[in-house]
Swiss-Prot record:
GO cellular component terms, semicolon-separated: catalytic step 2 spliceosome; nucleus; post-mRNA release spliceosomal complex; Prp19 complex; U2-type catalytic step 2 spliceosome
Main location: nucleus
Annotated spans, Disordered: 1-25
Family the UniProt entry places it in: Belongs to the SYF2 family.
One Gene Ontology term from the biological process aspect of the record: mRNA splicing, via spliceosome
Coiled-coil ranges (or none): 64-85
Organism: Danio rerio
PANTHER family: GCIP-INTERACTING PROTEIN P29 (PTHR13264), PRE-MRNA-SPLICING FACTOR SYF2 (PTHR13264:SF5)
Disulphide bridges, residue numbers: none
Name used for this protein in its record: Pre-mRNA-splicing factor syf2
Self-association and partners: Identified in the spliceosome C complex.
């Protein structure tokens, strides 16, 4: 009886063999949980990236450049207001902040980007006026952000959007447009007078149309024909 009631205690060897197995199982479970967590995180990040890419694709192709230009113009307007409050000239303050080389490089870049070829036709003159007027338009970033919040995802319309044609300009915008148009009319009235005739100028034309043609030809080819004209005047032309 005594031998049957004896409880057999586990040996130390069995404990030693079970403990590493449990540790390995726990290690595998821990790695599995880490992989599961990383997979969920990767899924979330991929979804966020897909959403952001879809938003970027819906934006205009030159949106980043426009945004940078608007931010720069907004910063320039703020500096101009600060200079006006201090009674300073913004152009002079700006020149004091940059070196002579940068100013010269900026001036060359400005002339290269917007050269003045002179009058070559009414269509070209009208196009240059349009470009000059559109560059003078100042963005209203406060109203822009307000409309962006109100419209949400429809702020950048697609083929399925119904937001087109629903915008109503404010009274301030209409007043600015009226003031700008009046300034254009006033400026146009000053330059619409017929130029006075110069009696001392050389007559190398037969009528007014031919005079305009000669001026245009001189503007484009004058530097190439200057030497020939001088030789003809001196009588040394071959």
């Amino acid at each position: 009886m005594a031998s049957s009631e004896e409880v057999v205690a586990p040996s130390n060897e069995e404990e030693v063999t079970e403990t590493p197995a449990a540790q390995k199982r726990e290690e595998r479970l821990r790695k599995f949980r880490e992989l599961h967590f990383k997979r969920n995180e990767a899924r979330k990040l991929n979804h966020q990236e897909v959403v952001e890419e879809d938003k970027r694709l819906k934006l205009p192709s030159n949106w980043e450049a426009k945004k940078a230009r608007l931010e720069y113009e907004l910063l320039v307007d703020q500096k101009k207001k600060e200079c006006a409050e201090r009674g300073e000239d913004y152009d002079r303050v700006k020149l004091l902040e940059i070196s002579a080389e940068d100013a010269e490089r900026w001036e060359r870049k400005k002339k290269k980007r917007n050269p003045d070829p002179g009058f070559s036709g009414y269509a070209e003159a009208q196009l240059r006026q349009y470009q000059r007027l559109t560059k003078q338009i100042k963005p209203d970033m406060e109203n822009y952000e307000k409309q962006k919040e109100e419209c949400g995802e429809d702020f950048h319309p697609t083929s399925n959007s119904l937001i087109y044609g629903t915008h109503v300009p404010s009274k301030d915008s209409i007043n600015r447009m009226v003031d700008d148009v009046e300034k254009q009319i006033e400026k146009r009235a000053k330059y619409s007078r017929r130029r006075a005739y110069n009696d001392d100028a050389d007559i190398d034309y037969i009528n007014e149309r031919n005079a305009k043609f000669n001026k245009k030809a001189e503007r484009f080819y004058g530097k190439y024909t200057a030497e020939i004209k001088q030789n003809l005047e001196r009588g040394t032309a071959v």
